[in-house]
Amino acid sequence: MVPEAELEQTNAGLVPASAGWFVLNARDARWFHRPGRDSLPLTGCDEFEAETYFRMLGMSLQVLSPGEPNSMYHWETEQEDFLVLFGEALLIVEGQERPLRRWDFVHCPPETRHVFVGAGDGPCVIVAASSRQFQKDGPWGYYTVDEAARRYNACSEEETQDSDVAYAHVPPSQPSRYREGLLPD
């Protein structure tokens, strides 16, 4: 029998504190905020939760303001999949720009270079899922330089595997509580 995980109340919201199954409402969970972008790593962040990090699957909610990227242009060694739940976004994939709207699904096989940028006149909500099966065997991927991504401040200044280098020009995300109105009703 699989036990229920303990949820720990932190200053920024609830986080899983042990292994096991759990139910967690996104509005009660700990988010990470930086200007223009909020994210909820539903399955843990390896740099923050070594004990409860999900080793096989990564999943997050990302809320983007218009013009704000969800990450820096990159590729990963694992498959990644995305679903636009609300609003509009611009996908930059392999140097091409593709507009996205609610319910658009994006599949990125391993090594697909990509980034999302909020679009339209309001926030965009994206659910992101990725395999983590092979990341233990070597590098997770790479931040790459791309002219289309650069136009949206969505790429590193240089090719690198170092996230500190890739994100040097943006403020770091900080743990935060859910902000009212962030998610649609």
Where are these regions (language model features)?
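Extended, acidic-biased charged interface segments
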Residues: 125-135, 145-146, 168-170, 174, ...
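A short, N-terminal "cap"/entry segment at the start of jelly-roll beta-barrel domains
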Residues: 1-56, 150-185
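Ligand-binding loop in jelly-roll beta-barrel domains
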Residues: 90, 110-137
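Conserved short histidine dyad/triad with adjacent acidic residue
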Residues: 41-47, 60-76, 110
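Surface-exposed, gly/pro-biased binding rims or lids
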Residues: 131-161
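Short, conserved beta-strand element in jelly-roll/cupin
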Residues: 56, 61-66, 74-92, 130-131
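Short acidic-glycine-tyrosine-enriched beta hairpin
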Residues: 81, 95-111
